[in-house]
Amino acid sequence: MVNPLYQKHIISINDLSREDLELALNVAASLKAKPQPELLKHKVIASCFFEASTRTRLSFETAMHRLGASVVGFADSNNTSLGKKGETLADTISVISQYVDAIVMRHPQEGASRLATEFSGGIPVLNAGDGANQHPTQTLLDLFTIQETQGRLNNINIAMVGDLKYGRTVHSLTQALAKFEGNRFYFIAPDALAMPDYILSMLKEKNIAYSLHNSIDEVVGELDILYMTRVQKERLDPSEYINIKSQFVLRAADLDNARPNLKVLHPLPRVDEITIDVDTTPYAYYFQQAGNGIYARQALLALVLNRELVL
């Protein structure tokens, strides 16, 4: 098939239409069911991580290898000319784009991935997270997991818990689910980490139902998806972190009144916000969710690097 994502930058979930998302999810499902180990043979992909990452980097690089691509890059920008010699991000991307067919990039600065597209010479840039801004590939794997567990992406009751201010995953996921009908959002966070106003305004403009809550207990019986997040220590003042981190913790007993179809998701890493007794409940799905990252990222790589895709 001829696909609309060929040679397209994947920077924000807003860059993708509902049809784009559905296409990528279908490709991810196909690749999970039937591996394609030579789909990106002879392609070279740069894995450029200017910020620490475990799951995103490893799943992206696993996705690249399992599609047959060659991988170059770095996991620590301090060992690059940018980190050691003061080279600009623009120059770094301009050079890397001469070597590769696509660039996967994580950076602590909001907007860095969008900036990189201006200097990539048309080479597709895939945002693997830019500060507290966007994390579109995490969003795609979240959508894939919701569809896998619920059989749909519409009429979903979803609660998002914890750090809704700095947590880029919840921003992107809310924007993505807003493209599908009938979804209902429950936001559970301390005032200091509440969902940003621009997200709430977007939901209001689209007449999408949402509500703000102080505890998981208030809504657990209504939910299809419970999306937990950690309080991000690296983005908070130490005293503020200590005061906030233990306010919203999920324990197995909190799920006593849950619907049978409920799944607990988490972008990981977790710290204290999900106790280990939740791991053995039928509701826990966060490790399978992480595994789905391979297929979601394979799908995007396959689409941006193949004009016609036959699976």
UniProtKB/Swiss-Prot annotation:
Task: Please verify whether the record's keywords include Transmembrane.
Answer: no
> So where does carbamoyl phosphate get bound?
55-56, 106, 135, 138, 268-269
- Note the coiled coil stretches, chain numbering: none
GO terms for MF: amino acid binding; aspartate carbamoyltransferase activity
One Gene Ontology cellular component term attached to this UniProt record is: cytosol
Binding-site list for L-aspartate: 85, 168, 230
Q: Cite the entry's keywords alphabetically.
A: Pyrimidine biosynthesis, Transferase
Q: A Pfam family this protein belongs to?
A: OTCace
Recorded hits in InterPro entries, A to Z, give: Asp/Orn_carbamoyltranf_P-bd (IPR006132), Asp/Orn_carbamoylTrfase (IPR006130), Asp/Orn_carbamoylTrfase_sf (IPR036901), Asp_carbamoyltransf (IPR002082), Asp_carbamoyltransf_Asp/Orn-bd (IPR006131)
Q: What EC number(s) does the entry state?
A: 2.1.3.2
| Swiss-Prot/TrEMBL GO biological process terms | 'de novo' pyrimidine nucleobase biosynthetic process; 'de novo' UMP biosynthetic process; amino acid metabolic process
Q: Which reaction does it catalyse?
A: carbamoyl phosphate + L-aspartate = N-carbamoyl-L-aspartate + phosphate + H(+)
Give the matching PROSITE patterns. CARBAMOYLTRANSFERASE (PS00097)
Q: Please tell me which top-level EC class this enzyme sits in.
A: transferase
Q: Which SUPFAM superfamilies match?
A: Aspartate/ornithine carbamoyltransferase
Q: In which pathway does it act?
A: Pyrimidine metabolism; UMP biosynthesis via de novo pathway; (S)-dihydroorotate from bicarbonate: step 2/3
Q: Is Transferase included in the keywords of this UniProt record? A: yes
Q: What are the cysteine partners in each disulfide bond?
A: none
Q: From what superkingdom does this record's organism come?
A: Bacteria
Per the similarity annotation, which family is this?
A: Belongs to the aspartate/ornithine carbamoyltransferase superfamily. ATCase family.
User: What PANTHER family does the database record attribute to this sequence?
Assistant: ASPARTATE CARBAMOYLTRANSFERASE, ORNITHINE CARBAMOYLTRANSFERASE, MITOCHONDRIAL
Name the job this protein performs.
Answer: Catalyzes the condensation of carbamoyl phosphate and aspartate to form carbamoyl aspartate and inorganic phosphate, the committed step in the de novo pyrimidine nucleotide biosynthesis pathway.
Subunit (UniProt): Heterododecamer (2C3:3R2) of six catalytic PyrB chains organized as two trimers (C3), and six regulatory PyrI chains organized as three dimers (R2).
This chain belongs to which protein, by name?
Aspartate carbamoyltransferase catalytic subunit
Q: Which organism is it from?
A: Pectobacterium atrosepticum (strain SCRI 1043 / ATCC BAA-672)
